[in-house]
């Protein structure tokens, strides 16, 4: 939007190569050890299609009678605009270390991260009486946090060289704040909304009915019908 074209997104990082210190220089087991930490912010409008700063009108099929009964051409808004829309802002903190052992043959990396996205851009939910296409809104705040680990092995001693690695990660995703009046609907099939943006839940989680399973045979269906008075 025209009112929020520019923003500032700073970042900072620091690292310490520990194996270069005097107390580790003579430790042959450790080839490399680095402790690191970083914090940064960035902006995004990737969820936003073009021309969202423009209000669109349509003339097609818009007619109304005047006082004499003569029909005149008219116009109506076909897409609303949200001039207060702001950048998505993501702040991420990361703490980790890189370790290599036995002449760089064995490597291990570990990270903890906490990523917080504010003013997440999503299509707004408004009363049907509003009319026209719904504008995008800053829908809320999403938090992602977890751990990442990678263990690797590299053999460079022979003509035949090879390497292998194993990684593992965890992720907790949650909508921590909802800035609109109701949950925001996402993808839909045949008119039914399948995914939702709702406070206290993972972002765009699937929402539907729980089932007790399926009938494996006619006897199970007959038993259910007898118990609940249905006609499956």
Q: Which ranges hold each PLM region?
A:
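Short, intrinsically disordered, charge-balanced linker/junction segments flanking boundaries
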Residues: 222-232
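Extracellular/periplasmic, surface-exposed regions of secreted and cell-surface proteins
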Residues: 1-206
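Exposed, low-structure sequence patches enriched in small/polar residues
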Residues: 167, 205-217, 221
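Generic structural signal for short, solvent-exposed loop/turn connectors between secondary structure elements
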Residues: 156-161, 214-216, 232
């Amino acid at each position: 939007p025209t009112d929020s074209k520019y923003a500032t997104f700073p970042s900072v990082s620091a690292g310490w190569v520990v194996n270069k210190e005097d107390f580790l220089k003579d430790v042959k087991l450790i080839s490399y050890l680095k402790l690191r930490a970083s914090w940064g912010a960035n902006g995004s409008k990737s969820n936003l299609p073009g021309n969202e700063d423009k209000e669109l009108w349509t003339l097609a099929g818009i007619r109304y009678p005047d006082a004499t009964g003569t029909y005149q051409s008219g116009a109506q808004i076909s897409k609303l605009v949200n001039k207060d829309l702001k950048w998505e802002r993501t702040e991420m903190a990361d703490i980790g270390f890189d370790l290599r052992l036995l002449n760089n043959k064995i490597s291990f990396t570990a990270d903890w991260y906490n990523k917080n996205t504010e003013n997440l851009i999503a299509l707004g939910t408004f009363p049907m009486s509003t009319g026209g296409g719904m504008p995008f809104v800053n829908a809320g705040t999403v938090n992602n946090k977890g751990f990442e680990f990678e263990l690797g092995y590299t053999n460079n001693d022979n003509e035949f060289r090879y390497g292998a690695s194993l990684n593992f990660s965890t992720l907790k995703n949650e909508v921590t704040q909802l800035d609109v009046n109701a949950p925001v609907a996402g993808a839909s099939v045949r008119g039914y909304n399948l995914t939702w943006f709702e406070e206290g839940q993972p972002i765009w989680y699937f929402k539907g009915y729980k089932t007790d399973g399926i009938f494996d045979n006619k006897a199970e269906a007959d038993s259910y019908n007898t118990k609940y008075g249905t006609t499956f």
